[in-house]
């Protein structure tokens, strides 16, 4: 297992505080609840480092499982139409949970409605990884997408924390990643 990044007041520490509050029904933070939460977060971190199962049963069509800069990425709905919309979907889960069936079904339904291809990265999660690593991998994915598709046909989409990640990535691209071509819509 990779080393867990320890930083003062980060998503990792905030997540731990939330878990402590949720697991401490009668009393505030105790050594027992803190140990329980740390064990839970370590188990979650180990689980997040393993490959995610292919979601073909959820999207009901063939799904390519590929690696983009070491980031597992699922792709489906591929067509020969050069103007096909592409949804780059970032799932929610508090930046630390893997996607669930709902994420795949929802984006698949939306994509079918507009005839879009879906790129669904299983992005790096806290507490092992940070936003800088995630943004770097997303930039590589985005560059691969626009090498084949027009930037104006790319749609950044996400739910919950994934929506925040998509918005943050779009803002970061606009400010710090001047070499990237921006999509016309986010």
What do the PLM-derived regions correspond to, one by one?
Residues 83-93:
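Short beta-strand element of the alpha/beta-hydrolase
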Residues 73, 88, 110, 131-185:
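Short strand-loop-helix active-site module centered on a catalytic nucleophile
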Residues 96, 127-128:
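Short, small-residue-enriched loops and turns at beta-alpha junctions
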Residues 1-79:
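A glycine/proline-hinged amphipathic helix-loop "lid/cap" segment
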Residues 122-126:
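Short beta-to-alpha linker loops that shape the active-site pocket of alpha/beta-hydrolase fold enzymes
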Residues 100-104, 132-135:
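Short, conserved loop/turn and helix-capping segments at secondary-structure boundaries
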Residues 101-119:
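Short amphipathic alpha-helix adjacent to the substrate-entry channel of hydrolases
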Residues 94-97, 102, 118, 144:
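Serine-hydrolase catalytic-loop signature spanning alpha/beta hydrolases and amidase-signature enzymes
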